Amino acid sequence: VEVWEDIKPFVEMVDEWSISQGGPRMTKFEVLTAMAYSCFADTPVDVVVAEVGMGGRWDATSVAHAEVAVVCPIGMDHMDYLGDTIEKIASEKAGIIKPTVGENTPHNPHGTVAVISHQDPAALHVLLEQAVDAQAVVAPPGSQG
């Protein structure tokens, strides 16, 4: 309840602006994600494992800049929102692979790491393009260290 009270004014502000532009209110997932990030800001943690919702590029979790992005097998899901081909869906989901922000850290001296599971070849091509654009190190399936 305390976290909700902390972020409620911001949720109301976003909702009012979105509605004034003809858009929707924040979704339950977006509000819960904001609440989680508020908790992490108030009580810093070393590591957060956050699962994206439907996609990666426009997902509520995309405001975080992860040192590691893990992409599980991509299938033909959420087609109404993400696209009607494996390439379009992969393009949306590839949005979690982002360039390193700021300095590399001792825990992550090489910048962003993209761990990509076994994929349809067309999806893999899209994910690898994004990894190159983000200058991410790609850890293929089965790699260690």
Model-predicted regions and their roles:
Residues 1-64, 76-83, 88, 121-122:
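ATP-dependent carboxylate-amine ligase catalytic core
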Residues 67-68, 81-96, 100-105, 112-145:
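Internal gly/pro-rich beta-alpha loop/helix module
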Residues 21-22, 111-113:
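A short, structure-level motif marking secondary-structure boundaries and short turns
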